[in-house]
Swiss-Prot record:
It catalyses: GTP + H2O = GDP + phosphate + H(+). The keyword Phosphoprotein does not apply. It comes from Chlorobium phaeobacteroides (strain DSM 266 / SMG 266 / 2430). It is found in: Cell inner membrane. This is Elongation factor 4. InterPro entries: EF-4 (IPR006297), EFG_III/V (IPR035647), EFG_V-like (IPR000640), EFTu-like_2 (IPR004161), LepA_C_sf (IPR038363), LepA_CTD (IPR013842), LepA_IV (IPR035654), P-loop_NTPase (IPR027417). Belongs to the TRAFAC class translation factor GTPase superfamily. Classic translation factor GTPase family. LepA subfamily. GO terms for biological process: positive regulation of translation. Required for accurate and efficient protein synthesis under certain stress conditions. May act as a fidelity factor of the translation reaction, by catalyzing a one-codon backward translocation of tRNAs on improperly translocated ribosomes. Back-translocation proceeds from a post-translocation (POST) complex to a pre-translocation (PRE) complex, thus giving elongation factor G a second chance to translocate the tRNAs correctly. Binds to ribosomes in a GTP-dependent manner. GO terms for cellular component: plasma membrane.
Length: 605
């Protein structure tokens, strides 16, 4: 007789690791279909787990989703399979690490036409660090351009596995998916049976429900959680009542108890989004565990940018929208700030540029807030002449040059996987971006893994787009933070009629300051509309102007009525016009269009 699926040795918790577009979400759909969690008629949209419009549109998974499937294996026993879907993009590696901590196994999905990509390798190392059982899967084997054996050799070189342990599937056509599920049952270890220990549960994701408050998705690692228990969160020591607990099989299914090994959800009327920190440990308040689960780290934003509402009266709407977004996104950090040019807004910290774009799009789409974004920048460390250290995440906070001793900037270690034909192009791009070339490994006869060290500031802009264009889309990249290093950095200010515009300031390397200033002045000249008076656009480092462009004034032809006539009369009219323009210039403020703030993002185009 089949044992009830709640038995801990009949649970399999696993995730899927893959690069963008390698077919992860489609594979998840096939698993849901084969285990009868969903039938085809319910699949109104492909990629059931990617439930944000943005996720489907960009073909990426942003949030960690979890779903429970029941499966009767070939041994006649019933198993509970918990699939935790993970994002595959470089910016979301923290989401991946949290999802991995909730699993015992991982499917390493590689596209048969693309081979191993940089992000796959990065997430694979995270999975190996977490001690997960890896099941390699080659997907899209039915495509005419697939190279199954070549990709298999890459995987064997990467993790030293036997050829017959690599599975071959086509998620779209449903080929090999049954064998894959059987492999999950046989190869992924069951969770440890720790029911007798004090409760410890890991929160790997959370969403905000307008009726129920925060819903925390968790994996029970030790102990038992019952409905009505008083639970305590380690990060802030707050105590809540477990109003509802249960499991997720696409929709929430309430249950009375969750035991060690289970993946489920917890609702306990948490009003403040910050109380259910993703990565936190939940325990019982009456008989608490002594220490939290390891592996949780406060997420560190790498890229900072100012977000300002286009209409200043939408400031409160922007605040509310950011609060709601921050609930579903543990990695978004924001603090209020003011700008002379843009008014009230927020300085936000993001994991990377894709993360920043997604937050901006979600603010505009889901919450209807129109925003202006300032130039993205990184966090600098400024050592003053008196020995104090100041952290600068906004160019306007940069101290006066006379007080600065040294400036340090964050460096990252980057691996770029590409075809060997593009090595020259990538080396050139690396040199342009102040990169330090380390070495190159050959993955096979045509693909290489190049290692560089870059200042983070040089890659947060448009590095990924440039890399894709010079390699015709074949290169993929992954980076991780190393340390801070000393650099010759300066603050470049933009002045309009001698008035600095704080939102256009930027911190750049001294060697690039002149070129950057010249390009920016030229770009702004084409964007800022003509005024009734002359407008001087200047780029300056401290008090030294390094570049200038002038927008000439719109002028009425005051001599139109002087047919011929006395020169002194004409001169008098021109002098009068000049006086008027001068007065206008003193009181007038140059209206800066929104495109001017975006100009910096596309300075090279």
């Amino acid at each position: 007789m089949a044992l009830p699926p709640t038995e801990v040795h009949h649970i399999r918790n696993f995730c899927i690791i893959a690069h963008i577009d390698h077919g992860k979400s489609t594979l998840a759909d096939r698993l849901l279909e084969i285990t009868n969690t969903l039938d085809r008629s319910q699949m109104s949209s492909a990629q059931v787990l990617d439930d944000m419009d943005l996720e489907r549109e960009r073909g990426i998974t942003i949030k960690s989703h979890a779903v429970q499937m029941k499966y009767r294996a070939s041994d006649g026993l019933d198993y509970t399979l918990n699939l935790i879907d993970t994002p595959g993009h470089v910016d979301f590696s923290y989401e991946v690490s949290r999802s991995l901590a909730a699993c015992e196994g991982a499917l390493l999905v590689v596209d048969a036409t693309q081979g191993v990509e940089a992000q796959t390798i990065a997430n694979l190392y995270l999975a190996l660090d977490a001690g997960l059982e890896i099941i390699p899967v080659i997907n899209k084997i039915d495509l005419p351009s697939s190279d199954v054996e070549g990709v298999a050799r890459q995987i064997i070189d990467l993790i030293g596995i036997k050829r017959d342990e690599i599975l071959q599937v086509s998620a779209k056509a449903g080929i090999g998916v049954y064998e894959l599920i059987e492999a999950i049952v046989k190869r992924v270890p069951a969770p440890s049976d720790n029911k007798h220990l004090p409760l410890r549960a890991l929160i790997f994701d959370s969403v905000f429900d307008i009726y129920r408050g925060t819903v925390a998705y968790l994996r029970i690692v030790d102990g038992v959680l019952k409905k009505g228990d008083k639970v305590r969160f380690f990060a802030n020591n707050k105590v809540f009542l477990a109003d509802e607990i249960g499991t997720m099989s696409l929709k929430r299914q309430p249950s009375a108890v969750l035991e060690a090994g289970d993946v489920g959800y917890l609702i306990c009327s948490i009003k403040d989004v910050k109380d259910a920190k993703v990565g936190d440990t939940v325990t019982l308040s009456d008989s608490p565990a002594l220490e939290a689960l390891a592996g949780y780290k406060e997420v560190k934003p790498m890229v900072f940018s100012g977000l300002y509402p286009v209409n200043s009266n939408e400031f409160e709407d922007l605040r509310e929208s950011l609060e709601k977004l921050a609930l579903n996104d543990a990695s978004l950090i924001y603090t209020p700030e003011t700008s002379v040019a843009l008014g009230f807004g927020f300085r936000c910290g993001f994991l990377g540029l894709l993360h920043m774009e997604i937050i901006q799009e979600r603010l505009e789409r889901e919450y209807g807030v129109n925003i202006i974004t300032t130039v993205p920048n990184v966090e600098y460390r400024v050592i003053l002449t008196n020995g104090d250290v100041v952290i600068v995440d906004n160019p306007s906070k940069m101290p006066d040059t006379s007080r600065i001793g040294d400036v340090e900037e964050p460096y990252v270690s980057m691996q770029i996987i590409t075809l060997s034909d593009y090595i020259g192009n990538i080396m050139k791009l690396g040199m342009e971006r102040r990169g330090e070339y380390k070495n190159t490994d050959y993955l096979d006869s045509t693909r290489v893994n190049m290692h560089f060290e870059f200042p983070l500031a040089e890659i947060v802009f448009d590095f990924h787009d440039k890399l894709k264009s010079i390699s015709k889309g074949y290169a993929s990249m992954d980076y991780e933070y190393i340390d801070y290093r000393q650099s010759d950095l300066v603050k470049l200010d933009v002045l309009l009629n001698a008035e600095p515009v704080d939102a256009l300031s930027i911190i750049v390397h001294r060697s690039k300051a002149y070129e950057w200033g010249r390009k920016l002045c030229t770009k702004l000249k084409g964007i800022i509309p003509k005024q009734m008076y002359e407008v001087a656009i200047q780029a300056a480092i401290g008090s030294r102007v390094i570049s200038r462009e002038t927008i000439s004034a719109m002028r009425k032809n005051v001599l139109a009525k002087c047919y011929g006539g006395d020169i002194s009369r004409k001169r008098k009219l021109l002098e009068k016009q000049k006086e008027g323009k001068k007065r206008m210039k003193q009181v007038g403020r140059v209206e800066i269009p929104q495109e001017a703030f975006l100009a910096i993002l596309t300075i090279d185009e």
